[in-house]
């Protein structure tokens, strides 16, 4: 009887460990990262490309070795930039057909799904937050404009009922957050830098 119980316990533990190993890399309770599957891929990624949403997907196999090491970087990215970019993971051991359909054959693979009409593309850079954000920032449409002495008065006096957003800074260029914010406004003429 003890042998049978030991055998049952062994198989139970083996199944628990195996199912956890094949499970999702990202814990939904720990971040807003989306665990993709065949049921939600189109609604979460494909359909959002028409809405200026940039998605960054980590295609992985639970046993690929590197994904577990790089998981924390992806979670950190999600915490910092979840409102700007959609970050997701896709378990290719579980969903082989979907990964194959996306052209993924090795793991880990990182792909960017920029707004249409740009095609999805493989990210070849280092898996470091600053490098990834810098690369993703290239795909952010910019509707913000720089104010100067020639257009400031026109801006202030035009359409007084519409709220205006101003950023005063001594830095060159328009910050990524302002580029993303400018997309939330219907008319590009009302966000100035």
What is each model feature region?
Residues 4-56, 76, 80-164, 169-172, ...:
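N-terminal leader/targeting and pre-domain segments
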Residues 61-62:
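Active-site beta-to-alpha loop of glycosyltransferases that engages the nucleotide-sugar donor
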Residues 65-82, 172-188:
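Typically the conserved alpha-helix immediately C-terminal to a functionally engaged Cys/Sec
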